[in-house]
A protein has these predicted regions:
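Surface-exposed extracellular loop regions of Gram-negative outer-membrane beta-barrel proteins
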Residues: 270-278, 383, 440, 454, ...
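Gram-negative outer-membrane beta-barrel transporters
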Residues: 421-423, 523-531, 548-644, 715
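Extracytoplasmic beta-strand/coil segments of soluble accessory domains associated
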Residues: 73, 84-88, 93-131, 148
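Short acidic/polar hinge/loop motifs at secondary-structure boundaries
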Residues: 114, 129-155
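Transmembrane beta-barrel wall of Gram-negative outer-membrane proteins
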Residues: 189-216, 227-268, 292-312, 360-366, ...
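Membrane-embedded beta-barrel scaffold of Gram-negative outer-membrane proteins
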Residues: 312-328, 455, 462, 477, ...
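Conserved C-terminal beta-signal and adjacent last beta-strands/turns
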Residues: 200, 245-247, 607-718
Length: 718
C-alpha cells in the first residue's frame, strides 16, 4: 500500500509540475497571474515583490482550491486575534469560543470546545492541507503565534471536506516575513510564565517563519475544586512551529511546515474522597494523589502548489506522530479506585493529499482530489488491579494485567465537484465523495453534496444545502479492550459487551442568511438539522483521563444561530447566540464503558441528550483603539453541560468575562518597532462555575472554570 501511494504521488507530482493549458480569451476570473504564459523563466525575487507573489498564490489557493461555497463561514483575522484580551497568548481553542455555535468544555474533553454540540469531530487545515487528528491530548497542540487568519466552516461543506465534518478550522499562516520578529513575555496568576519568540525573513525566492513558546503554570487543566488555587494542577508545555516556502519558478511554489508540542500535566485532585477500604489504610487523603500525564504531538508536511492559466493544483505529503501517557499513582489509586492503570496511546500516521481546480468555462469550475492516510496505533492499558475471590471478597494482593493492542489501518477518500454559476448572483455547487475505511471495522460510503448560494440584492447572501457525511472513529480511541483479562478482578466490567466502534453516517441540512445592514454593521442567521445512524460520542470512562469512543444507534441535532458584527475605525462590537438540541439513543458499541446496566437499558429505549450538548450558548465582545491605546472585553455564556443519570440533568448555567487594556510605545529612534504593554484579566468578575459535575455519561471528575486571573504582557518587535 505504501509503495502504491508513493508511486501515485510521484506521478501526480510530475504531471502537476509540467501541466500546461492554453489560455482562453474569454477567461474572466480575476485571479492574479491567470493571464501569464504557461512557460516562464525561473524567478528569483526578494522583499515586497516576493511577498506580493506569495500573496497572489495564497489568494489563488484559497479562491480556487478551497472554496467555501455555501458552508457557514466565520472568519477571524490577525487584528481580531490581537484585540482579544489575551492577544496572541489566547489558546486556539479559546479563540473559537467567540464564534456562534461553539461551546466551552474542559481540556480533558479535547478539544475543550464543541461545534454545534458534537464531540471532537473537528478538522484542522493549515494552508489548505489537512492536519490529521492525534490521540486527544490534554492541551491545544496548535497555538496562535503562526496564525495569519482563520475560519471555522460548518454546515453543509463542499465535497473536498470529508471525514471530520462538525467543523473545519481553516488556518492561513502569517505571510509578512520582513527580516525581524517579536519577543514576548506573558505571565501572572497561578505562577504563570510564558515567553515566546517569532522570527521571519526571506532570501532569494524563499521565505521562512519560526515561532517557539514555553509555558509553565500552576493551573494546567480545569480545577477539580472551586477554590482559587487548584490542587495538583501544574503544567509545563513547549511548542514550536516552522514554515518555509520557495518558488521553483513563477508558477510553482514548494511549501514546507513542521510543528511540535509537548505537554506535561498534573491531574487535579478531588478533595474529601474516601479510600474504598480494599487496599491500604482508610486514613489516606485524596489531596495527596499524584496522577500525571505527558502528551506529544509532532507533524511535518511538504506541499507543491501550481498556478497556471486555468488550472490550480496542490499536492502534499504529510506525517504526524502523537502519543499520550497517563501515569497513575500506584499506591493511592489502588486505595481510592481499586485500580492503577498506566495508559499509553501512540499513533504514527503518513498521508498524501491532492486537490485540483480547473476553470473549464465562465460558468463552470471543476474540482477533484483525493486524500489517503495510513496509521499505526499502539494502545496499552497496563493495569494494577485487585483479585476478587469467588465469594466476592476483594483480596489485597495486587496483580498486573497487560491489555495491549496494535493496529495498522488506512482511510482513503476521493471527491469531484462542479461549481456552476447559473447567473452572476446564483451559484449551484454539486459534488460527491467516496470514502473507504479499513481499521477495526471496514466500511465505505458515497456522499453527495449540493448547495445553492443566492445574492438576491446587494449586500444579501442566502445559502441552502444538503450533504451526506461519513465520519470514521479515531483509531486510537476506538481500540477494543480484552475484557476477559479482567475477569475476577476489581476491573471486571458490569456490562460484558464490547461491540466494535463504527463510522457515523449522517444527512445534514443547512439554511443561512447574511445581510449587510449598514456600511459597518452585518448580521447573519443560520438553521440546521442533522440526522444520523451509528452516531459517535466519547467520554472519559474509569479513572484515567483519556477518551474512548462509542456509538449510539440513532441521533439527531438541530439548532439556530444568530450573529451581529459592527466594525468602524478602531471600534468593533460583536455578539453571537445559538440554540441547539442534540439527542441520541441506544449504545451499540463499547457498551461496557457505560458501567451501569440500568443506565444502558434506559439509553436503549429512550432518546437522551448527548454529553457535550448545551441548549443555549452565547458570546460577545468589544474592542477599541484610540491612537496608541487599546482596550478589549469579551465574554461567554453557556446553559450548562449534561449531568446526572443518562444525562437527564445539566450543570448550572455560567458566564465568564475577560478584559484587557494596553498601549503601544515607541522608545527606539527608528519608531517602527513598537513596544507593547498589556494588562489582562481572565474571569474578571470571579464567577465560580462548574463545567462538568462528574455525574453524566463518560465524565471523569468534577471540572470547574478558572477563577479570576490577572496577567501582564510585554512584547517587543525587532
Amino acid at each position: 500500500m505504501v509503495r502504491i501511494v508513493r508511486s501515485i504521488g510521484v506521478c501526480i507530482l510530475s504531471l502537476a509540475a509540467g501541466a500546461t493549458f492554453p489560455a482562453r480569451a474569454d477567461q474572466q476570473d480575476s485571479a492574479g497571474g491567470d493571464d501569464q504564459q504557461s512557460s516562464q523563466p525561473q524567478v528569483v525575487v526578494t522583499g515586497h515583490s516576493l511577498q506580493e507573489k506569495n500573496a497572489e498564490l495564497d489568494a489563488a489557493r484559497d479562491r480556487n482550491l478551497l472554496p467555501k461555497l455555501g458552508a457557514t463561514d466565520y472568519s477571524i483575522d490577525q487584528q481580531d486575534l490581537q484585540t482579544l484580551p489575551q492577544g496572541k497568548n489566547t489558546p486556539l481553542d479559546k479563540v473559537v469560543l467567540q464564534i456562534p455555535g461553539v461551546s466551552y468544555d474542559s481540556a480533558i474533553s479535547n478539544p475543550d470546545f464543541h461545534v454545534r454540540n458534537e464531540y471532537a469531530n473537528v478538522q484542522y487545515r493549515i494552508n489548505g492541507i489537512q492536519l490529521p487528528d492525534g490521540v486527544s491530548a490534554l492541551g491545544p497542540v496548535l497555538g496562535t503565534d503562526f496564525v495569519g487568519s482563520m475560519s471555522l466552516l460548518d454546515g453543509t461543506l463542499p465535497a473536498q471536506y470529508g471525514l471530520r465534518t462538525a467543523g473545519v478550522l481553516d488556518i492561513t499562516t502569517k505571510s509578512q516575513f520582513d527580516q525581524g520578529g517579536t519577543l514576548d513575555i506573558y505571565g501572572g496568576s497561578w505562577s504563570t510564565v510564558s515567553p515566546s519568540v517569532e522570527y521571519g525573513g526571506s532570501g532569494g525566492a524563499s521565505q521562512y517563519f519560526l515561532s517557539g513558546r514555553y509555558l509553565q503554570s500552576e493551573q494546567g487543566l480545569e480545577s477539580a475544586t472551586p477554590t482559587a488555587n487548584p490542587i495538583h494542577d501544574d503544567t509545563s508545555q513547549e511548542r514550536f512551529f516552522g514554515y518555509g516556502s520557495t518558488f521553483l519558478d513563477d508558477a510553482d511554489r514548494l511549501t514546507y511546515m513542521t510543528g511540535a508540542w509537548v505537554g506535561r500535566f498534573q491531574i487535579p485532585n478531588v478533595l474529601g474522597e474516601q479510600p474504598l477500604g480494599d487496599y491500604g489504610p482508610d486514613t489516606l487523603s485524596s489531596a495527596d494523589i499524584n496522577e500525571n500525564e505527558k502528551d506529544r504531538f509532532f507533524f511535518a508536511l511538504v506541499a507543491l502548489q501550481t498556478h497556471r492559466d486555468d488550472l490550480d493544483t496542490q499536492l502534499s505529503v504529510f506525517t504526524r506522530y502523537a502519543s499520550i501517557n497517563f501515569m497513575p499513582d500506584p499506591y493511592y489509586d489502588l486505595a481510592f479506585n481499586d485500580v492503577a492503570a498506566n495508559v499509553v496511546r501512540k499513533s504514527l500516521l503518513n498521508g498524501l493529499q491532492f486537490d485540483a481546480a480547473w476553470r473549464w468555462s465562465d460558468a463552470h469550475t471543476l474540482r477533484a482530489g483525493f486524500v489517503t492516510t495510513i496509521e499505526h496505533t499502539q494502545v496499552q492499558d497496563l493495569a494494577t488491579v485487585l483479585p476478587v475471590a469467588p465469594d466476592g471478597v476483594v483480596l489485597p494482593t495486587p496483580l498486573t494485567v497487560n491489555d495491549y493492542t496494535q493496529k495498522t489501518g488506512w482511510i482513503a477518500g476521493v471527491y469531484g465537484q462542479d461549481e456552476w454559476r447559473l447567473r452572476p448572483n446564483l451559484t449551484l455547487n454539486t459534488g460527491v465523495r467516496f470514502d473507504q475505511l479499513n481499521q477495526f471495522v471496514s466500511a465505505n460510503q458515497v456522499s453527495p453534496r449540493i448547495v445553492l448560494v443566492y445574492d438576491p440584492v446587494a449586500d444579501t447572501t442566502l445559502h441552502a444545502g444538503i450533504s451526506r457525511y461519513f465520519t470514521p472513529p479515531m483509531q486510537a480511541q476506538a481500540t477494543p479492550s480484552d475484557l476477559a483479562l479482567f475477569q475476577n478482578t476489581t476491573q471486571q466490567p458490569a456490562i460484558p459487551l464490547d461491540d466494535p466502534v463504527r463510522p457515523e453516517r449522517a444527512t445534514y441540512v443547512d439554511l443561512g442568511l447574511e445581510q449587510k445592514l449598514l456600511a459597518a454593521l452585518t448580521a447573519g442567521a443560520d438553521v440546521y438539522y442533522k440526522h444520523g445512524t451509528d452516531m459517535l460520542d466519547d467520554g472519559t470512562f474509569g479513572n484515567a483521563a483519556v477518551l474512548s469512543q462509542f456509538n449510539y444507534a440513532l441521533g439527531y441535532s438541530k439548532g439556530a444561530e444568530l450573529k451581529l458584527n459592527y466594525q468602524h475605525d478602531g471600534l468593533r462590537i460583536y455578539g453571537n447566540y445559538a440554540h441547539e438540541i442534540t439527542k441520541a439513543k441506544d449504545v451499540i458499541s463499547n457498551q461496557y464503558l457505560i458501567g451501569d446496566p440500568v443506565e444502558l437499558a434506559y439509553l436503549a429505549s429512550n432518546y437522551t441528550y448527548a454529553s457535550d450538548a448545551q441548549t443555549n450558548t452565547a458570546s460577545a465582545g468589544a474592542s477599541y483603539r484610540w491612537q496608541e491605546t487599546f482596550a478589549s472585553f469579551d465574554g461567554i455564556y453557556g446553559s450548562g453541560l449534561r449531568a446526572g443519570f443518562a444525562n437527564l440533568q445539566h450543570s448550572p448555567d455560567y458566564t465568564q468575562c475577560n478584559a484587557a487594556v494596553g498601549r503601544y510605545f515607541h522608545p527606539w529612534p527608528s519608531g517602527d518597532k513598537p513596544l507593547t504593554l498589556r494588562l489582562s484579566a481572565v474571569n474578571l468578575f470571579d464567577r465560580i462555575y462548574v463545567l462538568r459535575a462528574a455525574t453524566g455519561v463518560g465524565e471523569f471528575a468534577p471540572q470547574y472554570g478558572p477563577r479570576r486571573g490577572i496577567f501582564g504582557e510585554i512584547t517587543q518587535q525587532f
